[in-house]
C-alpha cells in the first residue's frame, strides 16, 4: 500500500551541528554510511557539500556548480542547508527549489528523511506547491451539494475518487489523487481547487476551509521550504505585483536552485499568458445567468435583486452583454486565425478592429 503523502516534516533533536563537517556525513565511515548496506564514498559529493556550505556562510554569496548524474547532489546541498539553518535558527528560512513537482516530492519524501535520520538534526521543513494544486474543501462541498444543477452525470462520477481520497489525505494536494487528475477534469479542477479571490476571504475560512492557507502559515515557521521553480517564480512575480499579501513565501535567507539551467524554461512557461477562445468562454459561462455553470453566481444575483428590485434590470441585461461578448470573442479569434493563415500575404492581413466594450444600464 502506498503511504499517504506528507508535506510537513519535523525532526526534533538538540544535536549541535556546528562541529560536523561534510566529510563526517558523506565520508566512507560517515554518518550517512550507516543508512546504506553498500555505501560508496563519492569524493565529489563531499567537495560539493563543502562548496555549498562555504557559499552559504558568506553573506551575499552566489555560487554556480555543475554536477553529473549519480554524484548525490541533493543530499550534498541538503546537508549544507540544514547546517546553515541550524546556525541561523532565528533568521529567515532556506528555500530549496526543484525543477519539477516530481523531483520536489522525491527530495522531500526520500532524501530529507534519510539524511535527517542519519545526522539526527533538528529540522522543520515544509513542501509547498502553487495554490491551484490544493483542494478547497469549501468549494468542493458546495459543488457536491449543487451537483445536480451544475454537473453532468459523467462529471459527478469523476468526483468519486476525490470523495474517497479526501477521507485519507492530510495535504489536500490533488496530485495525490491520480484517479481524478488523470481524467478529463479540467473544468472540475477549476471548480474545486484553492482560488486566491475566494480562499483568501473569510467566507472560505468560516465554512470548511482550504488546505493551502494553513500550510502557508506553517511555512512561515519552517527552517527549510521545498518548492518548485514555477512557485519560486510566481512568488517573485507576486511580490513585484503586490499580490497574495506580498508573496506566497516568507522572505528567505538563502535560496538553492536545483537544475538551475531549467529556470529560464520554467519562467517562460510560468509567465506566459494564454488567451484562448475556450478559456474566455469558460469565464463567460460562469457569469451567464442562463448557463448551468453559473448556478451559484445566479443565485447570489437573485438574492441581491430580491432586496434591491432595480438590480434585476441589470441582471437581465447581463444576458445580452454576455451574448455580445461571446460574439465579439468569436470574431476576434476568427480574424486572428485568418491573419495567421495569411500572415505572409500583405493584402490579406488586415488590422483587427472591433469594439470589445460593453455598457451596463
Spans of model-derived segments:
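A substrate-engagement module of RecA-like helicase motors
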Residues: 2-35, 88-225, 229-230, 285-319, ...
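SF2 helicase catalytic motif II
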Residues: 248-281
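Residues immediately C-terminal
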Residues: 103, 232, 262-265
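Walker A/P-loop
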Residues: 58-79
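Conserved pre-motif I regulatory segment
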Residues: 15-65
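Walker A/P-loop NTP-binding motif
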Residues: 53-55, 74-89, 110-114
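Conserved helix/coil segment N-terminal to the catalytic DExD/H
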Residues: 213-220, 230-249
Amino acid at each position: 500500500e502506498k503511504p499517504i503523502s506528507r508535506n510537513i516534516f519535523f525532526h526534533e533533536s538538540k544535536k549541535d551541528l556546528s562541529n560536523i563537517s561534510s566529510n563526517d556525513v558523506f565520508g566512507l565511515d560517515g554518518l550517512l554510511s550507516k543508512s546504506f548496506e553498500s555505501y560508496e564514498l563519492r569524493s565529489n559529493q563531499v567537495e560539493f557539500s563543502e562548496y555549498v556550505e562555504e557559499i552559504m556562510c558568506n553573506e551575499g554569496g552566489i555560487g554556480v556548480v555543475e554536477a553529473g548524474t549519480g554524484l548525490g547532489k541533493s543530499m550534498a546541498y541538503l546537508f549544507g542547508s540544514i547546517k546553515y539553518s541550524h546556525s541561523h535558527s532565528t533568521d529567515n528560512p532556506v528555500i530549496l527549489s526543484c525543477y519539477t513537482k516530481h523531483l520536489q516530492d522525491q527530495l522531500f519524501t526520500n532524501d530529507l528523511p534519510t539524511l535527517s535520520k542519519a545526522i539526527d538534526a533538528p529540522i522543520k521543513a515544509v513542501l509547498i506547491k502553487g495554490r491551484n494544486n490544493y483542494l478547497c474543501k469549501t468549494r468542493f462541498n458546495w459543488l457536491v451539494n449543487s451537483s445536480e444543477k451544475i454537473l453532468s452525470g459523467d462529471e459527478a462520477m469523476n468526483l468519486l475518487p476525490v470523495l474517497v481520497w479526501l477521507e485519507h489525505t492530510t495535504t489536500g494536494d490533488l496530485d495525490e489523487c491520480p484517479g481524478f487528475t488523470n481524467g478529463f477534469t479540467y473544468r472540475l479542477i477549476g471548480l474545486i481547487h484553492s482560488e486566491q479571490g475566494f480562499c483568501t476571504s473569510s467566507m472560505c475560512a468560516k465554512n470548511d476551509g482550504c488546505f493551502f492557507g494553513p500550510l502557508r502559515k506553517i511555512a512561515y515557521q519552517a527552517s527549510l521550504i521545498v518548492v518548485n521553480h514555477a512557485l519560486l517564480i510566481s512568488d517573485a512575480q507576486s511580490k513585484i505585483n503586490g499580490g497574495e499579501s506580498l508573496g506566497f513565501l516568507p522572505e528567505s535567507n538563502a535560496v538553492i536552485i536545483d537544475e538551475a539551467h531549467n529556470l529560464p524554461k520554467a519562467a517562460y512557461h510560468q509567465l506566459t499568458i494564454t488567451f484562448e477562445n475556450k478559456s474566455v468562454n469558460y469565464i463567460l459561462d460562469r457569469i451567464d445567468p442562463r448557463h448551468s455553470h453559473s448556478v451559484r453566481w445566479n443565485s447570489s444575483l437573485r438574492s441581491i435583486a430580491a432586496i434591491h428590485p432595480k438590480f434585476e434590470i441589470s441582471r437581465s441585461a447581463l444576458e445580452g452583454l454576455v451574448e455580445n461578448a461571446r460574439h465579439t470573442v468569436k470574431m476576434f479569434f476568427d480574424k486572428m486565425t485568418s491573419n495567421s493563415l495569411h500572415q505572409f500575404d500583405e493584402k490579406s492581413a488586415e488590422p483587427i478592429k472591433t469594439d470589445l466594450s460593453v455598457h451596463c444600464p
